[in-house]
Amino acid sequence: RPEWCVKILNGEKTVEIRKNRPKLKPPFKCYIYCTKAQKKLITIFRDGDVFGDGEVYRGKPQFVTWDGGDIPIEIRQKEQTVIAEFVCDKIRPIIGKTWIVKEDIERATSGSCLSLKQIIEYAGWSHCSSFTERKELYAWHISDLKIYDQPKSLSGFSRHDFRGMNGTDVCGNE
């Protein structure tokens, strides 16, 4: 998401918390794809609605949305592109079954820009009736960040050896 991209690019976010990890052993290269900002519905204008100044709206329903507005323009212009790469030089497992002390989790996730509450919510730990039901999380360490001068289109990334079921390098989901 764009708000996380801002934090990674400015060096504030140095740890990515994930529910999974690749089979690769660190170090390995990762690419940062900046998604489009999520829009939030503010209101819907419907035919016959009266505005505060007494004006009456006429027409089809109009959805009024807001995308946060606090994302810098330089990131907005790079949405839906690959904007950087980094090397994940270590992955620290966060084992929910054994992590009982709040300070231990905070230390393991330091640099993630997430609160303990956000981590617990993301992991789904708040719904667990016991520690043994908690799933693992993984703290991916971000190092050797390289920010692209020009963002790259996702279409420029492919596995050269990939051959789909139809014998081509295209998945057919266009």
What are these regions (language model features)?
Residues 1-174:
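Structured alpha/beta reader/binder surfaces that contact nucleic acids or chromatin modification marks
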